[in-house]
Amino acid sequence: MLNREDNQYQEKLLKISRVSKTTKGGRTISFSVLAAVGDGEGKIGLGLGKANGVPDAIRKAIAAAKKNIVKISLKNNTIPHEIAGKWGATTLWMAPAYEGTGVIAGSASREILELVGVHDILTKIKGSRNKHNVARATVEALKLLRTAEQIAALRGLEVKDILS
């Protein structure tokens, strides 16, 4: 185990659902929670928790989110380049914005971008607007972000050649 402080992450509940399973003996009710954790400096994690009670489901979702943390490349409180992410029937498009624009995003993508530490961004959701799909598409798109230095290293070029 790594010695990390758990309080370094902000936690947000994106969705709490009451779900039921019908059996021969009647309906069994349980809860499903989608949670996100982030440090506001480029790290984000998403987790799903299921349990018979809401508090247990929340605890499981946050624990799962902390296990799935990924590092995102940011540039001046925005993203370095345009990107699109897809999850299920959801397609999410994101573009960098000038300082002072704010987070122009809806649904779960706004909450995730705020947890990551993005302050200026433009987004557009196409297809399904289901919170779970939007959250996953947002994280998948953020994982694809690369800085100019990373792209130059992958292509075997210098940074000035990439930016020109």
Swiss-Prot record:
The keyword Ribosomal protein applies. GO terms for cellular component: cytosolic small ribosomal subunit. Residues 9-72 form the S5 DRBM domain. Keywords: Ribonucleoprotein, Ribosomal protein, RNA-binding, rRNA-binding. Pfam families: Ribosomal_S5, Ribosomal_S5_C. InterPro entries: Ribosomal_Su5_D2-typ_SF, Ribosomal_uS5, Ribosomal_uS5_bac-type, Ribosomal_uS5_C, Ribosomal_uS5_N, Ribosomal_uS5_N_CS, Ribsml_uS5_D2-typ_fold_subgr. One of its GO terms (biological process) is translation. It comes from the Bacteria. One of its GO terms (molecular function) is structural constituent of ribosome. Belongs to the universal ribosomal protein uS5 family. Part of the 30S ribosomal subunit. Contacts proteins S4 and S8. HAMAP family: Ribosomal_uS5_B (MF_01307_B). With S4 and S12 plays an important role in translational accuracy. Located at the back of the 30S subunit body where it stabilizes the conformation of the head with respect to the body. The N-terminal domain interacts with the head of the 30S subunit; the C-terminal domain interacts with the body and contacts protein S4. The interaction surface between S4 and S5 is involved in control of translational fidelity. This is Small ribosomal subunit protein uS5.
